Amino acid sequence: MSLHLSNVILHQLSKNDQDELMVNYRSESLVNDSSTENLVAELHRVFHSKAGKGFGCFQSDSEFQIWLNELQRGELNFYDFSQKCAVRLKEELAKYPFADEGILVFAEYQSLATDYLFVGILPLNQSLKVTEGLDISATDYLDINKMDIAARIDLSVYEADKESNRYLSYIKGRVGRKVADFFLDFLQAEVGLDSKQQNQVLMQALDDFCTDAKLEKQEVNEYKKQVYEYCNGQIKAGEEVEIRELSGELPPSPSGASFLEFTQEQGYGLEESFPADRGLVRKLTKYVGAGGGLNVSFDSLLLGERIFYDPETDTLTIKGTPPNLRDQLTRNR
């Protein structure tokens, strides 16, 4: 991975005897070497792979934004920037029930010609190691894959377009922890691009496009398969869905209108690009549902062929079961 590291520093969040959250500040930034580059590269990879990220932008009175601008102009050095932010983060984090201990990371770096600022809390975990004398001892390690309190600012987009609603991204975290609320409060930011909503609108626009074109079932399935393959390819490549590019992959309607023209004429309000939602994209070629101890998933092509649904009785009929399922059912009659 091509990554150029500019600055990185660690501070530690811990609780004192009164269970109050404290910050143990490192005295200076870390040296830029292979270890720190590998750390930031792993942070970038894990953050990028996290599903369901939120996007936003700074509020007009954001202190974090003021400090960031001062950092960008060279009026504030990286160490002082990290200290100011650490104080504010500690004050905000103390308001929430998940005020975890951990390692606070600030990193400024470039990857694939894009500049980023990363802020995150890395959980510390314990494991065992074997010493040179072949004894067993405990050791702490950074559990980066379990990171769920982190945000990243695309500095390249931020510098080019401060009116953008998506230069800031953050991990939404586990349900019930309100991690997203915390990070928005800390950064004094507001929700911007809703990528899941954009994906839902895309799916609706595709359904409407097929209906408007009066396509046969087989043609509809082929359209959805093409959209799935494009979106899935973008997910694997770490790229976003580009509506113009997607439209170029699809054949026009019988009237000659492209998918892009259709979405623009009908006013769907789709952004030019946005991250694909893996769960929603999957439903283009599959019917998926779970609940009440039942988990059902099958290719959409099978509906009406081997699988039939009766909405009046809410009954799903399957003709021809998979061999391994049939074997289990036969043995346990």
From Swiss-Prot:
Give GO terms: molecular function aspect only: double-stranded DNA binding; single-stranded RNA binding
Q: Does the keyword Cytoplasm apply?
A: yes
The record's keywords, sorted A to Z, are:
Cytoplasm
What InterPro entries does the database record attribute to this sequence? Nucleoid_associated_NdpA
Please indicate if the UniProt record lists Ribonucleoprotein as a keyword: no
Q: Quick one: a GO cellular component term?
A: cytoplasm
Compartment(s) of residence: Cytoplasm, Nucleoid
Query: Pfam families under this entry?
Result: NA37
Concerning its family, UniProt says: Belongs to the YejK family.
Protein name (database record)? Nucleoid-associated protein VV1167
The scientific name of the source species is Vibrio vulnificus (strain YJ016)
